[in-house]
Amino acid sequence: MGNASSIVQTINVTGDGNVFKPSAETSSTAVPSLSLSPGMLNPGGVPWIAIGDETSVTSPGALRRMTSKDIPETAIINTDNSSGAVPSESALVPYNDEPLVVVTEHAIANFTKAEMALEFNREFLDKLRVLSVSPKYSDLLTYVDCYVGVSARQALNNFQKQVPVITPTRQTMYVDSIQAALKALEKWEIDLRVAQTLLPTNVPIGEVSCPMQSVVKLLDDQLPDDSLIRRYPKEAAVALAKRNGGIQWMDVSEGTVMNEAVNAVAASALAPSASAPPLEEKSKLTEQAMDLVTAAEPEIIASLVPVPAPVFAIPPKPADYNVRTLKIDEATWLRMIPKTMGTPFQIQVTDNTGTNWHLNLRGGTRVVNLDQIAPMRFVLDLGGKSYKETSWDPNGKKVGFIVFQSKIPFELWTAASQIGQATVVNYVQLYAEDSSFTAQSIIATTSLAYNYEPEQLNKTDPEMNYYLLATFIDSAAITPTNMTQPDVWDALLTMSPLSAGEVTVKGAVVSEVVPAELIGSYTPESLNASLPNDAARCMIDRASKIAEAIKIDDDAGPDEYSPNSVPIQGQLAISQLETGYGVRIFNPKGILSKIASRAMQAFIGDPSTIITQAAPVLSDKNNWIALAQGVKTSLRTKSLSAGVKTAVSKLSSSESIQNWTQGFLDKVSTHFPAPKPDCPTNGDGSEPSARRVKRDSYAGVVKRGYTR
């Protein structure tokens, strides 16, 4: 049967001697960060075996997949399997002829960590009679000598000894047992977290304390009636002690108090020192900053040579516009009938059902030139607009998207005869109510949508122009004097690209982009009018990641140099020595340092400044290249240090939280006082509570044991 010894500790949840003294060095942690992504667990390869002893493994077909039938019986019956939770003995586990797979050390380590995570709740699982014996992944593994590889050709040069292998059935059975236990722990884990957050059980720095009996009284007073902690108080006490070294229970039988937490390594990494933030925090922040820089691809966004559009493009993001407020010469994807055209003209179009619709065109009417638009979704919202006139009430009226085709440019239209074909692709009916202001009628939220895809229009004639208009339509003729609006573009137009790889530059679709040439090449107006998939917007999105990385890493203030601003300073120092036109100004290093720092701070505040011509420093592509490459170098050469200001600020902030926490716990001990030695008690040793009747007594002992 084997040798075993047990240790039994007897605790009294409401008794004397228990300790509640959270500290930064004993902060509670129980979250197992498992790395179970497919890319980490696989591929470990598969085991291969030679067909015969006399056959050379280099011969064609000399290796075959190893199966469970190839494992000796002595290896199948794993004598080390003493847990029995998921037994590997052939009498208990289905012993079918299955292919074997190699298990990586990464998988073994993570499944073992998952087993450890379950044991935080061992006493509760025993109470439920779930997973009554601790699982042990290693008991399901068999170690064999074999060739290892994903293919036979790879395996023939990779013979290994003592390779851990497992069958799919055993692997599935093991994971199912872990999942069943986790399912049983769902509400239990929530209730434990409620108990740990109902009052402060952690402190960012230093130490705080409160009488444990006061803490227990507060929990008894405030926990929900259906909390599992009420039903299983003793098991909860043990589980909390394992998570938080500041919660300690006295062993009644021995009169000793011991720290039962199992997270000493993690807790120490989470605790700050006397002069520095926690090691875990510094590591995580540096990792985040480096991930952002990697995602931005500094080499791509600073390239001086063309980059293919699909490489430079980012996942498309919607952009909002008010078409009526965009300058036609900036928004090159718009067209407009000149305002000087005097007489409006009416046209009649149909929709896909053959219904006839009437609409008016006049001077000032605007359309989207679909020939300059990549596949796009248009959504127009007139919500909040009025469009009311003396003889025109928008309530009940219809607005629609109309697609035109004509060989005559839109800005030259003066009559319906100049239009080739037109169709209503979608329309909605408006609902409007009188505004609080006189003579206005506010339109409710609308969603007039159209998905434009060039293939729908059968563009075979290169001389044909295609346009999209949004305006009022009606089944009867619309009197021009009643409805005088040129269109309904005075609304919120949301444009969402339907393709990810297409890029435009100022309204023109391009096949490649020179990123460095984008720097300082847009006016604020042209940037505002650029399409959602414009190269400038792609550049700004990538540059924003650089700015965010700098913000995470850099705590320098305005006019202060830092590792991330000095790349600009170095470029400025050289550029002022270069021969050029005009009067050269030589700035000393102190001035250059401030100029570089201010440029970096402006970039962090608004990354789009690198694109617009208004930026005094970073609109120069040389300064931008220096910054993009310098930030990458700065982060790659950084250790686990923190900025001076960051360290001081975090420590002083942590001390303020510590003081607040202790003040709160002092109030807990005041309003839920622990019984004094001379206070009368009930028969079970607990103090009578005038506040409420106890629904579930915490009094009693728990015997906690484990084998070794």
Curated annotation (Swiss-Prot):
GO molecular function terms noted in the UniProt entry: host cell surface binding
Q: Which domain of life is it from?
A: Viruses
* Annotated site residue numbers, Cleavage: 42-43
Query: Per the UniProt annotation, where are the glycans attached?
Result: 12, 81, 110, 458, 482, 528, 659
Keyword tags: Apoptosis, Capsid protein, Glycoprotein, Host cell membrane, Host endoplasmic reticulum, Host membrane, Host mitochondrion, Lipoprotein, Membrane, Myristate, Outer capsid protein, Viral penetration into host cytoplasm, Viral penetration via permeabilization of host membrane, Virion, Virus entry into host cell
Q: Which InterPro entries match?
A: Mu1/VP4, Mu1/VP4_sf, Mu1_membr_pen_domI, Mu1_membr_pen_domII, Mu1_membr_pen_domIII, Mu1_membr_pen_domIV
- Region Disordered: list its residue ranges: 674-708
* GO cellular component assignments: host cell endoplasmic reticulum; host cell mitochondrion; host cell plasma membrane; membrane; viral capsid; viral outer capsid
**According to the Swiss-Prot or TrEMBL entry, at which residues is a lipid covalently attached (N-myristoyl glycine)?**
2
Q: Which GO terms describe its biological process?
A: symbiont entry into host cell via permeabilization of host membrane
| The record's account of how the chain is modified after translation | Cleaved during the endosomal proteolytic disassembly of the outer capsid. Mu-1 is proteolytically cleaved into mu-1N and mu-1C during the maturation step to generate the ISVP. Cleavage of mu-1 to mu-1C is dependent on myristoylation and binding to sigma-3 protein. Mu-1C is further cleaved into delta (59 kDa), and phi (13 kDa) segments during entry into the host cell cytoplasm. Mu-1 and mu-1N are N-terminally myristoylated. This acylation is essential for the membrane fusion activity.
Its assembly, as annotated, is: Heterohexamer of three sigma-3 and three Mu-1 proteins.
Per the record, the similarity remark reads: Belongs to the orthoreovirus mu-1 protein family.
Q: What does this protein do?
A: Major outer capsid protein involved in host cell membrane penetration. In the endocytic compartment, outer-capsid protein sigma-3 is removed by cathepsin proteases, which exposes the viral membrane-penetration protein mu-1. Both myristoylated peptides mu-1N and phi are released during infectious subvirion particles (ISVP) formation in the endosome. They associate with host membranes and mu-1N induces permeabilization and delivery of transcriptionally active viral particles into the host cell cytoplasm. Seems to induce apoptosis in the host cell. The viral outer shell polypeptides, of which mu-1 is one, impose structural constraints that prevent elongation of nascent transcripts by the RNA-dependent RNA polymerase lambda-3.
Q: What is recorded about the domains?
A: The C-terminal region, phi, determines both targeting to intracellular membranes and induction of apoptosis.
What protein name applies here? Outer capsid protein mu-1
Per the UniProt record, the lineage of the source organism begins with: Viruses, Riboviria, Orthornavirae, Duplornaviricota, Resentoviricetes
